[in-house]
C-alpha cells in the first residue's frame, strides 16, 4: 500500500507526522539510515519504545566519514535493533493491529518486522516543481532544484531563491546564511556579496552519541587529489575524556599537507557540535593547522584539548 492509503492513517508516518502522535508506541519500525532515521531512533528508544531500524546499506549515516559511520553504527546497535542490507518490498497488516514490513536481503531471503507504528525516513527529494516557477521562465536542474548563481539570483532578473528550494544542503543555518546574502544584495545591488560555498557546510546529528561534521571526508579529499594528512584523536586520550571514562568517541581531522589548511573535521561523541565550532571558524577565516594548534591557549583540562592534540597529530609544521 502507498503512504496515502486510508487504512494506514495513524500508523505510517513521516518525520512531519511522527512528532504529533498522542501516545508513545510500544514498538516502532524505522525505514532508512540517514540523520532523520538516526535522530528519531534515538528519541523513541530513549523513551522506552522498542525500535527496529531497517536500512539498505551495511551501515547507518553512510554519508558521514567512513570511520564515523562505522562507529555510530556500532553504538546504535547497543541501543536498538538494526536490520542492515535489507530492501523493503512490502508493507502489510501484521498481528494485533500492527504493521508488518517485509524486506529482502541480497540472497533473496525475505524477513518480516512488526511495529505499532512505521516511520518512513528514507530521505526527502526536492519538490520545487510544485512552485511552477517554469511559468516565469526560471530554470531548474535535473534534481528539482532552482538554479541560482553565487549571489542567489535565478536566470530571471528580479527573482532570487534560497534555502532548500535551491540548495542540496537542506539545513536551517545554510538557509539563514543565504537569507542574509539575498537581503544584502537586494538592498545593495551595486555591491553584491556571494554565498560562502568554499567547503561542505557544517552539520550535526543530534543522537547518542552526537555527531558533527564540516568539509571533506577522508575519501572525498583523496578523490579530489589533495595531499592528505589524517589524524584520529580519541576522547579518552585527554584528561576530560579520561574523566568521562569515554570509550569509542573521537575527533578526525583531514588536512592538506601542501597548503597546511584543514579540509574537514568529523567528530563523534559528547558535545560534538560544540567541539567542531573552532574548526569551522579556522576553515572560514583561513587559519592554517600550525597557527590553530600553537597560536592560542587551549584550556586544561577541557575537552577541547582533543582538538588541540588532533591538530598536532596531523604532523604539519609551520614554515621555518
Segment roles from a protein language model:
Residues 1-3, 38-39, 44, 61, ...:
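Glycine/Thr-rich phosphate-binding loops of Rossmann-like dinucleotide-binding domains
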Residues 13, 81-83, 229-231:
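General small-molecule cofactor/ligand-binding pocket signal
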Residues 50, 81-82, 139, 227, ...:
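Residue-level detector of anion-binding/catalytic polar loops
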Residues 8-25, 112-192:
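FAD-site-proximal beta/loop scaffold in flavoenzymes
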Residues 95, 142, 257-259:
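Short acidic-glycine loop/turn motifs at beta-strand connectors
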Residues 19-20, 25-29, 35-104, 108-109, ...:
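Rossmann-like dinucleotide-binding cores of NAD(P)H-dependent redox enzymes
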Residues 206-217, 222-320:
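Flexible, glycine-rich terminal cap/loop adjacent to redox cofactors
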Amino acid at each position: 500500500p502507498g503512504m496515502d492509503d486510508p487504512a494506514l492513517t495513524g500508523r505510517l508516518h513521516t518525520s512531519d507526522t511522527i512528532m504529533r502522535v498522542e501516545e508513545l508506541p510500544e514498538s516502532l519500525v524505522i525505514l532508512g539510515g540517514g540523520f532523520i532515521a538516526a535522530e528519531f531512533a534515538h528519541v523513541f528508544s530513549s523513551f522506552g519504545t522498542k525500535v527496529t531500524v531497517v536500512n539498505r546499506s551495511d551501515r547507518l549515516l553512510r554519508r558521514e566519514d567512513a570511520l564515523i559511520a562505522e562507529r555510530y553504527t556500532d553504538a546504535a546497535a547497543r541501543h536498538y535493533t538494526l536490520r542492515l542490507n535489507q530492501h523493503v518490498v512490502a508493507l502489510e497488516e501484521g498481528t494485533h493491529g500492527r504493521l508488518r514490513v517485509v524486506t529482502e536481503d541480497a540472497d533473496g531471503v525475505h524477513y518480516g518486522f512488526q511495529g505499532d507504528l512505521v516511520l518512513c525516513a528514507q530521505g526527502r527529494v526536492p519538490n520545487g516543481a510544485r512552485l511552477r516557477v517554469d511559468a516565469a521562465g526560471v530554470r531548474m536542474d535535473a534534481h528539482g532544484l532552482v538554479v541560482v548563481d553565487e549571489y542567489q539570483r535565478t536566470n530571471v532578473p528580479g527573482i532570487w531563491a534560497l534555502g532548500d528550494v535551491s540548495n542540496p544542503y537542506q539545513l536551517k543555518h545554510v538557509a539563514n546564511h543565504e537569507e542574509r546574502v539575498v537581503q544584502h544584495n537586494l538592498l545593495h545591488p551595486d555591491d553584491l556579496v556571494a554565498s560562502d560555498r568554499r567547503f561542505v557546510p557544517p552539520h550535526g546529528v543530534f543522537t547518542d552519541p552526537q555527531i558533527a561534521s564540516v568539509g571533506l571526508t577522508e575519501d572525498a579529499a583523496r578523490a579530489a587529489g589533495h595531499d592528505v594528512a589524517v589524524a584520529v584523536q580519541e576522547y579518552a586520550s585527554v584528561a576530560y575524556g579520561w574523566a568521562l571514562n569515554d570509550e569509542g568517541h573521537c575527533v578526525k581531522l583531514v588536512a592538506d599537507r601542501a597548503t597546511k589548511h584543514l579540509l574537514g573535521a568529523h567528530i563523534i561523541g559528547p558535545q560534538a557540535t560544540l567541539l567542531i565550532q573552532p574548526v569551522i571558524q579556522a576553515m572560514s577565516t583561513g587559519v592554517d593547522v600550525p597557527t590553530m594548534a600553537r597560536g592560542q591557549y587551549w584550556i586544561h583540562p577541557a575537552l577541547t584539548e582533543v582538538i588541540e592534540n588532533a591538530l598536532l597529530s596531523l604532523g604539519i609544521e609551520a614554515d621555518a
